[in-house]
Amino acid sequence: GEAMASADALHLVSGDGSLPLLDHVPEVLRVHLHLLEPHRGLYEDTLHRLVDGTPKRNLSLTKAALSRARKRDQALMASLLSMEGSRVSGNSTFSAERAKEVYGADAGVLWPCVDTEEFPQDPSGDPENPYPGNDEYVVCIGRASWAKGTWETVSMLSGTGLSLTHVG
């Protein structure tokens, strides 16, 4: 309402369900959308698969059921892209490329910021590594899922002698 009416611009970070906020943005307000990625559930089947890649349900039925949500998402992005002075940035070159593929948006890249103070020079105060071995290992962070490549990682490591530590 009032805050947006007096603002010069709006910075919106996309997330599940944030694009409908665009319905409430005055058309004269410049918007910068930091698009983390187009909604995977609407545009890819990766979220509709088990960790081994097996479909959770019939993928054709899932795609049909999500067609209305996909159209709504496309309409919201088309509305944003038609607003004068509005811009879209991805958080990686991959996200920027996906914005072009999915929405036709020419997106720049706004890299995530890293605070080097979070990583002290002296690691002696760090918690002890929970991995019991002294050999090399691979770390995966996040929920185990097909979308995050968990199964692909396990397959690629098979026979290499590398261990996998999964956190999350």
Q: Locations of the language-model features?
A:
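Membrane-proximal helix-turn-helix segments that form the acceptor-binding/catalytic region
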Residues: 4, 39, 50-88, 95-97
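Active-site donor-binding segments of glycosyltransferases and PAPS-dependent sulfotransferases
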Residues: 1-19
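Short, well-ordered alpha-helix to beta-strand connector turns
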Residues: 6-8, 28-29, 83-86, 161
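Acidic anion/phosphate-binding donor-loop and adjacent secondary structure
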Residues: 97, 102, 114-136
